[in-house]
C-alpha cells in the first residue's frame, strides 16, 4: 500500500486535527447538557426547520436535519473515496483490498455477536446489536497521530482503508435493518432520480448543478421512502464522473471541496448534537444492564479482538500482508482504536431505540465509556508497548 501514503498524507493530517476538534465538541456538549444551558441546548436541537412546496411539506427538528441531512454528505464523501480507490487507487489491486476488508468484517461480526450473547432473550434490546460495530474514524485517527513518528504511515493508511469498508458496512446495516414503513411512491421517485444521474454519467455531463438537483430529489425521496436518508449520499457518489470530457478531475475536485466542511463543520456539529448525554438522569443500576454491558464489551473487547483476529488470519494464510514497516504489535494497537465508536455508535443507537431515554441514557454512557477506554488504552499501548521494531 505504498503509493497511497503520499496521496492521502494531507487527508491524514486534516482528519487528525478534525478529530481533536471532535473531542472538544464532545466535551462541550457534555458540559452544556449538564450545565445551566441545558434547556437552551435541547431547544436548539428540537427547533423545527423545514419548507413546503404546494402540498409537499418537510418539517423536522434541527437534530434530525443533522442526522439525516448533514451526515448524508459524510457518506457521500465516503462513496466518492470508495469509487476513486476502486477505479484508480490501491483497491484496483484485489490484494490490497483483502486486509482492510477482513479487518472491517471481523470488526462487525465479533462485536455484534458479543452484544447478542449478553442480551439474548430480550427482543427489544437486541435491536441495538449494530451499535458496537461502528468506528469513529476521525477520533481513532487523531489518537493514532498522537502516538508519534514511531508508528509507520502504512498503519494510518490501513486505518483509513478499514474505515471505508466499516462505513460501507454501516450503510448496509442502516439500509437493511433500520428502516421503517416503506413507501412505493417515494421509491419510484428515487428510481427516477437515480436514472437521471445514470444518464448524466453516460453522457459525460459534468454540470455540478444537475447532480446537485438530482441528489436533493433522491435524498428527499429516500427520506420519505422509509429507508434511512444516508443511503442517498453513497448512491449519488457512484454516479459522479471521474473526470470531465477535457480530462480534468471532476470527482477529485468535489471530494477536495468537501474535506474542510466535513472535518471542521459537519462532523463537529454532529458530535455536538449527539454527545449531549444528561448524566444526572442516568440510573447507576442501569449502567450494568444488558444493553450497557453489551455495548461496552462489543466496543472495547469485540472490536479489537474481531479486527485483529480476522486481520491475523488473512496474514497467516497469506491472503494479505502486514502494512509495510509495521509489526503485529503495532497492528494490534490500531485494532484497539477501532473500539472508539462514539459518534457513529451514538447515531446507530438513535436509529435502534428511537426513544433515547428508554434506558435512562445508560446506553449512551456505555458508548462514551467504551470509546474513552479504547482511546486511552490504544494510545498507551501504541506509545509504550508497540514501538517500531
From Swiss-Prot:
Swiss-Prot/TrEMBL GO biological process terms: regulation of pH
Reaction(s) this enzyme catalyzes, per UniProt: Na(+)(in) + 2 H(+)(out) = Na(+)(out) + 2 H(+)(in)
Ion transport keyword on record: yes
TM spans (from-to): 12-32, 62-82, 97-117, 128-148, 157-177, 184-204, 220-240, 260-280, 282-302, 331-351, 365-385
Gene3D superfamilies: Na+/H+ antiporter like domain
Keyword Magnesium: no
An example Gene Ontology CC term for this record: plasma membrane
Superkingdom of the source species: Bacteria
Record's subcellular location: Cell inner membrane
Keywords of this entry: Antiport, Cell inner membrane, Cell membrane, Ion transport, Membrane, Sodium, Sodium transport, Transmembrane, Transmembrane helix, Transport
GO molecular function, one term: sodium:proton antiporter activity
Coiled coil spans: none
Membrane topology of this protein: Multi-pass membrane protein
Described purpose of this protein according to its UniProt entry: Na(+)/H(+) antiporter that extrudes sodium in exchange for external protons.
Protein family membership: Belongs to the NhaA Na(+)/H(+) (TC 2.A.33) antiporter family.
This protein's name: Na(+)/H(+) antiporter NhaA 1
Gene name, Swiss-Prot/TrEMBL: nhaA1
Amino acid at each position: 500500500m505504498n503509493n497511497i501514503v503520499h496521496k492521502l498524507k494531507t487527508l491524514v493530517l486534516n482528519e487528525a486535527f478534525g478529530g481533536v476538534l471532535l473531542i472538544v465538541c464532545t466535551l462541550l456538549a457534555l458540559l452544556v447538557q449538564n450545565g445551566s444551558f441545558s434547556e437552551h441546548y435541547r431547544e436548539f436541537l428540537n427547533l423545527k426547520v423545514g419548507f413546503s412546496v404546494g402540498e409537499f411539506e418537510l418539517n423536522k427538528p434541527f437534530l434530525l436535519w443533522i442526522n439525516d441531512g448533514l451526515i448524508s454528505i459524510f457518506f457521500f464523501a465516503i462513496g466518492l473515496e470508495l469509487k476513486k480507490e476502486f477505479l484508480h487507487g490501491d483497491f484496483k489491486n484485489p490484494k490490497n483490498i483483502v486486509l482492510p476488508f477482513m479487518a472491517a468484517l471481523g470488526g462487525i461480526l465479533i462485536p455484534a455477536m458479543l452484544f447478542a450473547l449478553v442480551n439474548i432473550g430480550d427482543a427489544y434490546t437486541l435491536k441495538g446489536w449494530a451499535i458496537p460495530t461502528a468506528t469513529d474514524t476521525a477520533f481513532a485517527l487523531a489518537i493514532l497521530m498522537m502516538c508519534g513518528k514511531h508508528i509507520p504511515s502504512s498503519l494510518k493508511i490501513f486505518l483509513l482503508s478499514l474505515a471505508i469498508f466499516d462505513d460501507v458496512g454501516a450503510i448496509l446495516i442502516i439500509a437493511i435493518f433500520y428502516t421503517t414503513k416503506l413507501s412505493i411512491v417515494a421509491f419510484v421517485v428515487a428510481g427516477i432520480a437515480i436514472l437521471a444521474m445514470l444518464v448524466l454519467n453516460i453522457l459525460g455531463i459534468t454540470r455540478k448543478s444537475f447532480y446537485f438537483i438530482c441528489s436533493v430529489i433522491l435524498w428527499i425521496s429516500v427520506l420519505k421512502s422509509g429507508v434511512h436518508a444516508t443511503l442517498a449520499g453513497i448512491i449519488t457518489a457512484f454516479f459522479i464522473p471521474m473526470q470531465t470530457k477535457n480530462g480534468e478531475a471532476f470527482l477529485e475536485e468535489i471530494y477536495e471541496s468537501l474535506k474542510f466542511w466535513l472535518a471542521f463543520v459537519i462532523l463537529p456539529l454532529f458530535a455536538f448534537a449527539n454527545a449531549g448525554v444528561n448524566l444526572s438522569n442516568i440510573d447507576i443500576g442501569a449502567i450494568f444492564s444488558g444493553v450497557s454491558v453489551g455495548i461496552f464489551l462489543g466496543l472495547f473487547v469485540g472490536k479489537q479482538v474481531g479486527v485483529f483476529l480476522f486481520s491475523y488470519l488473512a496474514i497467516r494464510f497469506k491472503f494479505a500482508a502486514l502494512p509495510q514497516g509495521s509489526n503485529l504489535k503495532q497492528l494490534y494497537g490500531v485494532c484497539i482504536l477501532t473500539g472508539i465508536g462514539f459518534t457513529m455508535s451514538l447515531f446507530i443507537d438513535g436509529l435502534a431505540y428511537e426513544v433515547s431515554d428508554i434506558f435512562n441514557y445508560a446506553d449512551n454512557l456505555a458508548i462514551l465509556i467504551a470509546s474513552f477506554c479504547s482511546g486511552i488504552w490504544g494510545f498507551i499501548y501504541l506509545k509504550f508497548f508497540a514501538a517500531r521494531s
